[in-house]
Amino acid sequence: LAMDKKTIIEETEKYYLPVFGRYPMVMELGHGCRVWDNEGNEYVDAFAGIAVNSLGYNHPVLVKAISEQAAKLMHCSNLYYTEIQVKALRVVAEATGMDRIFFANCGAEGNEGAMKLARKYGVSKAPTKYKIISADESFHGRTFDTLAATGHDYYHVGYGPLSPGHVLVPYGDIKALEAQMDDDVCAVLLEPIQGEGGVHVPPAEYLQQVRALCDKHDALLIFDEVQTGVARTGKWFAYMHSGVKPDILTFAKGIGGGFPVAGFAVPERLAHVFKPGDHGGTFGGNPLACAAVYATLTTIKSEGLVDKVAEKGEYFKNELRTLQEKYPDKVTDVRGCGLMLGMEVAGEGKPIVESCLENHVIVNCTAGNVIRIVPPLIISKEEIDIVVAALDKALAAC
C-alpha cells in the first residue's frame, strides 16, 4: 500500500541525515514542466530540480534511452569500452567545444577533478605553483576541497582549517584578482554567471580580463558551468556569450536531463596531465549515464532548444521587469541570461517562494532575497505567464 504524506515525511526525517531544509510536499509524478504531489495537486515547475531537468519530466526520448540501456547494460566499469560512452563523449565534446572529457557523478566531483588537474599542471611547472583563486559568493560544491573554493563563510564554519592553497576575491573585480595573481597561481576558478550567490552576471569585459591575467601567469582558467551549461543561458555553454574559452570546463546538472552525471572537459594540450591511475571513479561514465547524456544533448539539438531558450528567456526577463516597474519598492533588480534568471527583492525571498507554492508554482530563493528561476528548457510562454502571475500575486501580498 502507498504511504500517505505524513508517513513519508516522518519516515524520511527518521532515517535521512538532517542536511536538507525541505518543503512539506511529497513529489509523485512529473510530465513536461508540470509536477504532481501525492495528494494530486498540480504545479508548474520553474526550478527543474535545481536546473537539472533540462527536458522537463518524462521526456519520451530520455525515458526510452534510459529504459533500453538499463535492459541492455547498466554498468561494467571503465576498465572496458562501450559504444554508448563513445556516443556520449562525441556529443559532449561538440557541445563544450573541447577535446577530452572525464565523466563523474555530480558537480562537486567535476570541480574536484578540475582543480586536481590544475594542481598537477601547476606543480609540474614549479613546486610552489598550487594556489587556486575563486570568488566571494561562489558555490562549487560541498566536498572538502570544493568547500575551500566556495566563497561563502556559512559553509566554512565548523570544519577547522580548510584545504590550503585557496584564495578568494570579489566577483567581477579585476583589480582585486590582479592583486592576488602571481606565478604561484595554478588556476582561477569562476562561474561565468554566479548561481547560488544570487544570479550575478559579471561586467562584459571581466572574463576577457581574467583570461589575459591567466595567460600572463600561465594559470589555467576553469569555468564552473555546472549550473550555467547545457543551453541554460541560451548558448550551449555560458562562456560562449563572451567568447572567452576556459582551459577546463566543468559540467553537471542539466547534462543528464535528470540522471546523475557530471564531469569536466579540457583541450588536447591538457589531455596528458593526468597519467593512468592519477584520477578515476567507479561509476563515472557508466552506460546508463552515457545513454542519458546522449539522449539529452541530441534532443536539445534536434528540438532547437538553444535558440528557443534565448528567445523565451528574453520574454521571461521582460515580464519580470514589468513586475519590477509595477512594484519598484519591492523588486530591486532583474538579471540573468536565457532561462537562468534572478529577481532580487527588497525583503526576504522565502515568503514569495511559499506564496508561489500555495498557488501551485515552484520557484526558489537563493542568497536570502533573490528569487531564482531555472525552469526546464522546454517551458512554454503560457507556463511562463502562469509563473509571472504567481509572482505578481506574491509581490502584491508581501
What is each residue range found by the language model?
Residues 2-398:
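Conserved N-terminal phosphate-binding loop of PLP-dependent enzymes in the Aspartate aminotransferase
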